[in-house]
């Protein structure tokens, strides 16, 4: 009799646990902020990997020390945003505006940024390894590139293939 009750209790517990996994959203789920107005928002230190910020206004927002791997910022306004120490590995920042953004020590490895605007951005210590950039943008970045990324150990100028 005790073993039958024990087996039923174990089965019930397993069913409850499986149900919770199917109903409750995990805390690390990617979020969709497409076309939101998030000016001056504070996302610092968060894990936003895989999230979508397409055509989102993030002007003057704090994204420092944030995991932004595989995030899409297509057409987003990141003017004057703080992305210091952010990890943008394999992110899409194509057609985004990063004018006067702080990319100090950011990692952009493998990012797609062909039509991105970087005018006045602080790129000291940023890692641009394998970033897809237009040649004219690359030349402008080389004019101000300096520093070494403390995480990857790569020199900013070398990751941009500066002469």
Regions found by a protein language model. Give the residues of each.
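Tandem repeat scaffolds
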Residues: 2-11, 15-163
């Amino acid at each position: 009799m005790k073993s039958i009750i024990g087996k039923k209790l174990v089965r019930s517990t397993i069913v409850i646990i499986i149900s919770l996994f199917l109903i409750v959203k995990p805390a690390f789920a990617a979020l969709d902020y497409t076309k939101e107005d998030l000016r001056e928002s504070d996302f610092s230190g968060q894990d936003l990997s895989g999230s979508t910020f397409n055509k989102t206004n993030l002007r003057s927002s704090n994204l420092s020390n944030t995991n932004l791997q595989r995030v899409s910022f297509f057409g987003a306004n990141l003017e004057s945003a703080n992305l210091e120490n952010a990890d943008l590995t394999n992110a899409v920042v194509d057609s985004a505006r990063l004018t006067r953004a702080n990319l100090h020590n950011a990692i952009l490895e493998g990012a797609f940024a062909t039509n991105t605007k970087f005018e006045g951005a602080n790129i000291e210590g940023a890692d641009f390894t394998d970033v897809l950039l237009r040649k004219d943008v690359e030349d402008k970045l080389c004019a101000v590139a300096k520093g070494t990324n403390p995480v990857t150990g790569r020199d900013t100028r070398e990751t941009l293939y500066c002469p």
